């Protein structure tokens, strides 16, 4: 049971995608940028909604609350993604439209695997730079969610919770610093993830990943901030 939960935490699927050899420069008018919402969510299991059925993850639910008729959403995320693996996934996906809203929630697997803070900062900065340089994403409003504290879950009870909490806080400080440098909205949901560490109503059946109820708490905080970002 323990092994299967651990593997589920950081194992990732891989999909072969056709890579476009040439990408032409795109001229984007102000009118196009202000048109329909196109939302790109980047992340790991927290953006996937691991353990939940249907479209119960927080990006889909956020999109449902702000979308209009012609709006679209795309999620590039896999359970187990580290920041570097997310960068590789973005590089290997052929984006076919311009996005004007992008979310990032990444880093828990960097912490879980014991990656150094120096490497994580380097990779997170690289991720932000990719978004700023890509013709399909550079016009977007970007927001970043902090890393939840997986130590504050029933699964985390068998780990050193104090150590996990301290490491999560350190990684989140790095994320916040990069966001401040790049004028990106940073949304702290970590404290919400620590609401009740032993309560199973806040996690899925694996005792680790957020339940629909926990995502709802996140969205209560995220939604008004994102609506403000889009004004």
Task: Give the positions of each predicted feature.
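Sec-dependent N-terminal signal peptides
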Residues: 1-6
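C-terminal motif of bacterial Sec signal peptides marking the signal peptidase cleavage site
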Residues: 9-12
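Membrane-interfacial segments
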Residues: 16-17, 230
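Serine-esterase "nucleophile elbow" of acetyl-processing enzymes
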Residues: 17-79, 89-96
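Residue-level detector of flexible, active-site-proximal loop/helix-junction positions
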Residues: 46, 80-82, 149, 193
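Short, flexible loop segments at the rims of nucleotide/cofactor-binding pockets, characterized by
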Residues: 78-82, 163-164
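Alpha-helical cap/lid subdomain in secreted, periplasmic
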Residues: 88-231
């Amino acid at each position: 049971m323990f092994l299967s939960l651990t593997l589920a935490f950081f194992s990732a699927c891989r999909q072969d995608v056709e890579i476009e050899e040439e990408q032409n420069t795109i001229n984007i008018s102000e009118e196009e940028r202000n048109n329909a919402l196109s939302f790109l969510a980047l992340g790991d299991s927290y953006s996937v909604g691991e353990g939940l059925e249907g479209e119960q993850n927080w990006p889909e639910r956020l999109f449902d609350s702000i979308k209009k008729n012609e709006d679209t959403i795309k999620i590039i995320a896999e359970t187990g993604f580290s920041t570097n693996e997310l960068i590789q996934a973005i590089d290997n996906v052929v984006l076919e439209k311009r996005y004007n809203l992008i979310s990032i929630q990444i880093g828990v697997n960097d912490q879980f695997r014991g990656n150094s803070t120096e490497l994580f900062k380097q990779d997170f900065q690289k991720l932000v730079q990719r978004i700023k340089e890509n013709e399909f994403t550079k016009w977007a409003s970007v927001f970043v969610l902090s890393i939840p504290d997986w130590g504050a879950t029933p699964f985390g009870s068998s780990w050193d919770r104090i150590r996990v909490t301290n490491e999560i806080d350190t990684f989140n400080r790095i994320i916040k610093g990069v966001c401040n440098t790049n004028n990106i909205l940073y949304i702290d949901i970590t404290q919400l993830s620590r609401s009740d560490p032993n309560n199973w109503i806040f996690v899925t059946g694996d005792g680790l990943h957020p339940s629909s109820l926990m995502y709802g708490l996140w969205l209560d905080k995220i939604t008004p901030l994102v609506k403000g970002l889009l004004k």
